[in-house]
């Protein structure tokens, strides 16, 4: 057996330890001891207390939702046939899924004690993302929606069969589905929604002695889920979106099933935690501190679901909590272009807390804005959202249609905001919300959140450009998470972003798949926005760690009348270096060179790039594998070729690279 995987694991543990405080080391040691005790039957749920079913909660999903029935009745056809789509993979699960099997690799994870099972080891669990995804049970909500809309028994029977098989195969604390509190929390949220849609405690699923026995069994697992989450919150450097998801799952669980005395105190713990983390993990300007747009929507769903559950059950969240949600929606509205495109900044794994809409053109970002428009009476959110979506209808009920329709959407100012200084993003542009819109999103934010910055990318001073709602310069996305290290490192590295690399190095040092060591510190030095131009100047110190330290400073000057963007990259050092500036184009772009001028066209929007220094040139790359270059990933585990233009230049002392971008449409 090769010792390389063992050495790699040791390196990861060492790097992880380097990012921990003394307090965290103590906490982790305590958790290890507790896991060992639990493995031998100590400090776990023994007998689950009897459930007092007289304490019934009010539903917060599905209250007279005015949705078109047919899509929801058709949606479970694949599930009934034993088929399911996991990310972009069509999977055959059969009538009874193997809940410990990774559908991508076929690996079956062992039914060992979950908290000591190494889910990062591909040889043990396969690709854990693929294993966990169906166990989140978003598809059970699809079955419950079909039953809710049709009343057909077959959907209820299928839902029960899926649940019974899961309870059979995933006993308390054993296997890969008892390793991550976040996964339990998401499953609990989807169980809650399914429970509500089938009629709650009085559902016909629970009729007769057999039904009552099944209900008791399901409730026993629900209690165990809540007990597990309460005892295994993500803390210290892991207290990111995971903690918010865990708190949300616990809160929703306690509200939905208030059948035990413990749920009263757990609900308060979860609510207090959410109130705190909502303000801590999301900047006052609305930017989620993970520095990842996908996690912005992920966290928003958790906060909204908990907030709505509390609102309907006499446990309302505070005004600052809801104000922070509104600010987060303002950020999404501001970075979204006129056609609804949102830049793929930071990590994305196609993970969702819930899947309530079966609309073909469903967009999670527009959906959130539609929900926000109704909740906060925001006409500007309505403009960005377009039509009211079904997810909003399921969450807010029939009244949402009238509220949305009656809401005035004229005389609104867009973008909502241009400057997100605390979060580190700046919106440059002109003629917003028109067919001639120019929208640039410049990044001078932190690498990520907390000491590991788990979901951040090394993208300091990068920017994206859309013209008339058509993407030109993009962030290429994420593609990989726990596996395929080469591609994981590429897509989150500096070379996969519209910025400058020095000596082939990342701005920040990778320490593991979700771990950064020495981190670049970026800052905005100048921000100006006026009628004639927008100007951004930012810098970062990521390359100061080199033997000969380098500072990278970038100025972006957008001249509105001429639709011209001048990008000046200045590198300051004492010695000599080799640098590269990369431009990543949307896969929808046709890209070509005419002499030394680079052109890109996306459905009528044409942009030219010209280097002021005549000795320099663009080199085009497309879909290169060995040294990855020229790729975009719109979905998890899916990548397609796209054009990347690379400009290589020597650096000696103070050196500047000037690129002129002209947008002709």
Residue ranges of model-derived segments:
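Boundary detector for helix-to-coil junctions that initiate low-complexity/charged tails
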Residues: 1-29
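A residue-level signal for conserved active-site and pocket-lining positions in enzyme catalytic cores
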Residues: 250, 332, 428, 569, ...
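Beta-strand-rich N-terminal accessory domains
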Residues: 16-20, 28, 32, 36, ...
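CBM-like, beta-strand-rich accessory domains located in the C-terminal region of large
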Residues: 185, 348-349, 355-361, 374-395, ...
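Carbohydrate-active enzyme catalytic cores, enriched for enzymes
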Residues: 287, 291-473, 525-530, 651
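Extended, charge-enriched "interface" segments that sit outside catalytic cores
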Residues: 27-122, 129-133
């Amino acid at each position: 057996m090769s010792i390389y995987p063992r050495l790699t694991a040791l390196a990861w543990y060492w790097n992880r330890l380097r990012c921990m405080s003394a307090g965290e080391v103590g906490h982790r040691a305590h958790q290890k001891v507790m896991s060992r005790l639990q493995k031998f039957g100590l400090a776990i749920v023994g007998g689950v207390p009897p459930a007092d079913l007289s304490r019934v909660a009010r539903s917060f999903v599905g209250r007279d939702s005015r949705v078109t029935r047919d899509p929801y009745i058709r949606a479970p056809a694949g599930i009934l046939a034993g088929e399911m789509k996991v990310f972009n993979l069509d999977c055959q699960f059969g009538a009874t899924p193997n809940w410990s099997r990774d559908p991508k690799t076929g690996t079956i994870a062992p039914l060992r004690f979950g908290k000591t099972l190494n889910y990062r080891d591909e040889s043990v669990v396969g690709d854990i993302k693929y294993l966990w995804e169906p166990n989140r049970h978003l598809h059970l909500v699809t079955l419950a929606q079909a039953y809710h809309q049709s009343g057909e028994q077959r959907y209820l029977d299928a839902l029960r069969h899926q649940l019974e098989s899961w309870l059979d195969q995933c006993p308390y604390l054993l296997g890969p589905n008892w390793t991550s509190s976040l996964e339990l929390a998401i499953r609990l949220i989807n169980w809650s929604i399914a429970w509500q849609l089938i009629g709650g405690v009085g559902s016909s699923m629970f009729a007769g002695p057999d039904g009552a026995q099944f209900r008791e069994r399901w409730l026993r697992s629900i209690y165990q889920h809540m007990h597990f989450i309460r005892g295994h919150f993500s803390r210290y450097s892991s207290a990111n979106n995971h903690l918010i998801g865990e708190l949300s799952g616990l809160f929703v669980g306690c509200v939905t099933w208030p059948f035990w005395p413990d749920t009263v105190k757990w609900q308060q713990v979860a609510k207090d935690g959410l109130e705190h983390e909502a303000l801590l993990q999301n900047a006052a300007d609305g930017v989620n501190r993970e520095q990842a747009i996908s996690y912005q929507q992920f966290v928003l769903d958790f906060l909204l679901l908990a907030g709505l559950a509390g609102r309907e059950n006499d446990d309302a969240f505070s005004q600052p909590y809801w104000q922070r949600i509104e600010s987060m929606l303002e950020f999404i509205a501001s970075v979204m272009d006129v056609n609804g495109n949102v830049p793929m900044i930071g990590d994305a794994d196609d993970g969702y807390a819930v899947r309530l809409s079966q609309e073909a053109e469903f967009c999670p970002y527009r959906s959130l804005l539609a929900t926000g428009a109704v909740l906060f009476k925001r006409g500007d959110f309505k403009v960005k959202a377009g039509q009211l979506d079904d997810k909003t209808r399921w969450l807010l009920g029939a009244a949402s249609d009238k509220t949305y329709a009656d809401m005035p959407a004229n005389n609104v100012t867009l973008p909502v905001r241009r400057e997100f200084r605390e979060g580190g993003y700046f919106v440059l542009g002109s003629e917003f919300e028109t067919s001639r819109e120019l929208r640039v999103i410049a990044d001078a934010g932190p690498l990520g959140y907390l000491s590991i910055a788990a979901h951040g990318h090394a993208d300091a001073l990068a920017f994206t450009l859309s013209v008339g709602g058509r993407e030109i310069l993009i962030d290429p996305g994420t593609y990989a998470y726990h596996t395929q290290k080469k591609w994981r490192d590429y897509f989150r590295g500096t070379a996969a972003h519209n910025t400058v690399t020095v000596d082939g190095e990342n701005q920040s040092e990778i320490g593991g798949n979700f771990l950064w060591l020495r981190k670049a510190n970026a800052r905005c030095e100048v921000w100006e926005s006026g009628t004639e131009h927008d100007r951004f100047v930012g810098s970062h110190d990521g390359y100061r760690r080199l033997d000969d330290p380098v500072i990278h400073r970038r100025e972006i000057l957008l001249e509105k009348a001429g639709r011209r963007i001048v990008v000046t990259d200045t590198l300051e050092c004492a010695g000599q270096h080799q640098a590269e500036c990369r431009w990543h184009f949307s896969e929808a772009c046709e890209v070509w060179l005419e002499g030394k001028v680079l052109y890109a066209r996306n459905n009528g929007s044409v942009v030219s790039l010209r280097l002021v220094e005549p000795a320099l040139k663009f080199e085009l790359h497309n879909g290169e594998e060995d040294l990855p270059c020229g790729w975009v990933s719109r979905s998890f585990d899916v990548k397609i070729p796209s054009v990347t233009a690379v400009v290589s230049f020597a650096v000696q002392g103070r050196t500047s690279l000037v690129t002129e971008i002209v947008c002709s449409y």
